């Protein structure tokens, strides 16, 4: 019953896109929307235009993607280093579905799989979608921090000119190095993060609430507390 209802909702979204998209962009908006499962099924969360269609470019799909974002059909997460540069934002982009349940349907996985604690690309995608959904509801603007191929903090949340860094781990044995790398960069002069505005760091985990020297551990289910 629930999967059927979720699929009906996804079909309605697709129908709305076809009907309401600006003239001449409906096909591109549909293709962008339909590429979301493919975007989520890879290790890197960075949006790849070639997964929309062969030969697809940011120039062609920038306007359709922006329309999906502005109409609340997807949740964007930009590279913090891009600032207000719209062109760069469209290149260094993470894109999430607006609902965790719809995400499971898009990826064709049963909801109970999320409770197994299994490390998988699908579980990671659904976890990040859940967190993005919670943070948006709490009024944060989403971005992420990256130091090239060395480290990435998936969520750098901003509100009232302050930033909060959030990483997560699905299983207790996963190592947490990204927050510490970000912390260490705070003491470097050449930084890729607005360090003077970095207020707090959190690790979302299966563990209970706990304080570490440089960050706070919060259970994943309590992401709304941040």
Descriptions of predicted regions:
Residues 147, 205-206:
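Cofactor-binding loop segments of dinucleotide-utilizing enzymes, especially the Rossmann-like FAD-
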Residues 107-110, 167, 177-178, 213-215:
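Short conserved micro-motifs at the rims of enzyme active sites and ligand-binding pockets
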Residues 172-183:
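Active-site-adjacent loop/helix micro-motif of nuclease/hydrolase catalytic cores
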């Amino acid at each position: 019953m629930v999967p059927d209802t979720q699929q009906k909702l996804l079909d309605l979204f697709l129908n709305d896109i076809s009907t309401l998209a600006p003239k001449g962009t409906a096909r591109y908006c549909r293709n962008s929307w339909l590429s979301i499962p493919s975007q989520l099924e890879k290790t890197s969360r960075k949006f790849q235009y070639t997964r929309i269609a062969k030969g697809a470019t940011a120039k062609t799909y920038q306007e359709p993607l922006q329309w999906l974002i502005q109409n609340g059909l997807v949740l964007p997460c930009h590279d913090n280093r891009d600032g207000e540069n719209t062109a760069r934002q469209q290149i260094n982009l993470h894109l999430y579905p607006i609902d965790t349940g719809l995400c499971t349907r898009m990826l064709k996985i049963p909801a109970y799989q999320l409770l197994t604690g299994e490390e998988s690309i699908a579980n990671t995608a659904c976890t990040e979608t859940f967190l993005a959904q919670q943070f948006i509801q709490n009024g944060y603007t989403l971005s992420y921090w990256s130091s090239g191929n060395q480290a990435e903090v998936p969520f750098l949340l901003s509100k009232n000119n302050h930033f909060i860094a959030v990483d997560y781990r699905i299983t207790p044995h996963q190592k947490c190095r990204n927050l510490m790398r970000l912390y260490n960069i705070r003491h470097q002069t050449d930084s890729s993060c607005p360090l003077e505005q970095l207020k707090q760091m959190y690790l979302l985990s299966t563990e209970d609430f706990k304080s570490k020297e440089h960050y706070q551990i919060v259970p994943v289910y309590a992401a709304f507390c941040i």
